[in-house]
C-alpha cells in the first residue's frame, strides 16, 4: 500500500521504482531503527525490488537468514537479481509455490545470508514462523513505481490502461469489477473512507452514470469532470488521485493486511526484536500509531521507539520526491 495520494500525483511506493531507478525511501533510518544483528533472522515484509533487503543482508552475514515477502511476482524476480547480482549465486525453486531460496556461493561475497523469497502478502507474515523466532521486521507499505510505471497494471491515471490495480496479478478481483458492480452509495463510501475524498458522493454519482468504465483514462476523465479543483489545495493534486487510492486499497485489502501484520508481529518477534513500518498516507500511519501505542500502554509487549513519525530530510525529498510523504514508526518487543 500507499504511495501518497495527496502530495504526489502518481503516488509513491515501498522502496520501489523502475528496475533502473530503484531508490529505497528512508533507507538509513529504516536500517538504523531495525538494528540488524549479525546472524539473526529478519523479515522484509514488502521486499519490492530488494533495496532495503540488500542493506539488511549485508549486515546479517553468512549465519543470518533474510525472509522477503511480496504479493507481486514481477517484483520478486527483480529482487532476486538485486539480492543475488553475481553469476556465482545459486537459486533453488520450491514447487509448486514458486518461492525461492537463495544462497551465496561466489568467492567475492562469501559472507552472505540465506535469503528466502516468498510470494505472499505481508498479512501472512506469521505463516511458518514459530513464536519469538524473528529478530526484526521491516514493512515499507504501498504501491511501487514498478507497478505505477506499467500502464498495463492500471495503477496510474497518467497513462491509458485497463482498470486492474492488483498488486498480485493472480488475485481475483480487479478495480474494473469493483467500480462497475458497487452501487452508488457503496462506491461513495469506499471513496470517502479509503480515499479521504470529501467529494465522494459527487464522484460516485458521475461514475455510476458513466458506467461501464474500462480504462484508467476514462475513469480519470469522469472524475475530473465531476470534481474540478476549487481551491489551491485541490489544484495541487489531480482530482482522480484520492479515488484511485481508494480503489487500490480496496482491491488489495491493504489496510486489513497491515492490521494483520501488526497483530502478528509481537507474537513472532523475539524480546528485543524490532518492527519498523514506513507508510505513505494518513490511514496507514494512523493504524501503525494506534497499534504501537496500544501495544505499549495496554498490552505491554511493545516499547515505542518513535514518539513522532520519522520523515525524510529535505535533501532526500529533493533527491527523491517519493519520500515527501513517507513516515516511519518503530517499536521494540519487550
PLM ranges: what are they?
Residues 1-87, 99-334:
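S-adenosyl-L-methionine-dependent methyltransferase catalytic core, i.e., the SAM/SAH-binding region
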Amino acid at each position: 500500500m500507499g504511495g501518497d495520494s495527496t502530495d504526489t500525483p502518481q503516488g509513491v511506493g515501498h522502496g520501489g521504482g523502475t528496475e533502473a531507478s530503484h531508490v529505497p525511501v528512508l533507507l538509513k533510518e529504516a536500517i538504523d531503527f531495525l538494528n540488524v544483528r549479525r546472524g539473526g533472522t529478519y523479515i522484509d515484509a514488502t521486499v519490492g525490488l530488494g533495496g532495503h533487503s540488500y542493506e539488511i543482508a549485508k549486515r546479517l552475514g553468512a549465519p543470518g537468514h533474510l525472509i522477503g515477502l511480496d504479493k507481486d511476482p514481477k517484483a520478486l524476480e527483480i529482487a532476486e537479481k538485486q539480492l543475488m547480482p553475481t553469476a556465482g549465486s545459486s537459486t533453488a525453486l520450491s514447487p509448486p509455490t514458486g518461492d525461492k531460496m537463495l544462497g551465496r556461493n561466489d568467492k567475492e561475497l562469501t559472507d552472505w545470508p540465506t535469503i528466502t523469497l516468498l510470494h505472499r502478502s505481508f498479512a501472512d507474515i506469521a505463516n511458518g514462523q514459530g513464536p519469538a523466532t524473528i529478530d526484526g521486521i521491516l514493512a515499507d507499505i504501498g504501491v511501487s513505481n514498478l507497478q505505477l510505471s506499467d500502464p498495463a497494471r492500471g495503477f496510474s491515471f497518467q497513462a491509458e490502461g485497463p482498470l486492474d490495480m492488483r498488486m498480485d496479478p493472480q488475485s481475483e478481483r480487479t478495480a474494473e469489477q469493483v467500480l462497475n458492480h458497487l452501487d452508488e452509495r457503496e462506491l461513495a463510501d469506499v471513496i470517502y473512507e479509503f480515499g479521504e475524498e470529501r467529494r465522494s458522493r459527487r464522484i460516485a454519482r458521475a461514475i455510476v452514470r458513466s458506467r461501464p468504465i474500462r480504462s484508467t483514462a476514462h475513469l480519470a476523465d469522469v472524475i475530473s469532470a465531476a470534481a474540478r479543483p476549487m481551491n489551491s489545495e485541490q489544484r495541487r493534486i489531480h482530482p482522480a488521485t484520492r479515488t484511485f487510492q481508494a480503489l487500490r486499497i480496496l482491491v488489495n485489502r491493504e489496510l486489513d493486511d497491515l492490521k494483520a501484520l501488526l497483530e502478528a508481529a509481537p507474537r513472532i518477534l523475539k524480546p528485543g526484536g524490532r518492527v519498523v513500518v514506513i507508510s505513505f498516507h494518513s490511514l496507514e500511519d494512523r493504524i501503525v500509531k494506534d497499534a504501537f501505542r496500544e501495544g505499549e500502554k495496554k498490552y505491554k509487549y511493545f516499547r515505542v521507539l518513535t514518539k513522532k513519525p520519522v520523515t525524510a530530510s529535505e535533501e532526500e525529498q529533493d533527491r527523491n520526491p517519493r519520500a515527501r510523504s513517507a513516515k516511519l514508526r518503530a517499536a521494540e518487543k519487550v
